[in-house]
């Protein structure tokens, strides 16, 4: 199955799940809690308030070497958006500069490490992890950082 098949399948619309494709073209569905969406909105708003020259967006489908992954929140520059639009592809053939995952208790550290690696391989400059305590962890391709290089004013905690 290809991402275009998923997007165009009417039976997969309006499901209470985040849908991704693994490297074998199989659908992977993850349940979404309302608080997850609230956190995504807070992060999106905070990014848009602090970073000019682009836009924060939720639920961003990114083509990776292990299938399609959907980042919870991303920030992409206008230049990156032009590159994504010019490719005319669904999903995005290159990752936005910042990819954020909102972790839940069902996410393992190994799963998050894999997603970070996939986003970096696809072109992300930073990957952020938001944990259930409200703490943010910032990563660049070299490892974990004390704060974001791209948005140094971003808080280390975002409470709901």
Positions of predicted regions on the chain:
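Gly/Pro/Ser/Thr-rich low-complexity, intrinsically disordered segments predominantly at protein N-termini
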Residues: 1-160
């Amino acid at each position: 199955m290809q991402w275009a098949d998923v997007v165009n399948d009417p039976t997969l619309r309006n499901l209470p799940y985040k849908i991704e494709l693994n490297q074998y073209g199989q659908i992977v569905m993850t349940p979404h809690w309302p608080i997850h969406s609230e956190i995504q909105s807070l992060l999106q708003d905070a990014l848009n308030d602090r970073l000019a020259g682009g836009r924060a967006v939720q639920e961003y489908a990114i083509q990776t070497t292990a299938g399609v992954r959907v980042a919870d929140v991303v920030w992409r520059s206008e230049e990156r958006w032009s590159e994504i639009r010019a490719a005319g592809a669904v999903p995005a053939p290159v990752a936005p500069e910042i990819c954020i995952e909102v972790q839940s208790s069902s996410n393992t550290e190994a799963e998050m490490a894999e997603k970070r690696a996939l986003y970096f391989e696809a072109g992300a400059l930073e990957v952020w992890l938001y944990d259930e305590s409200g703490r943010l962890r910032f990563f660049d391709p070299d490892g974990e950082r004390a704060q974001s290089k791209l948005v140094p004013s971003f808080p280390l905690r975002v409470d709901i």
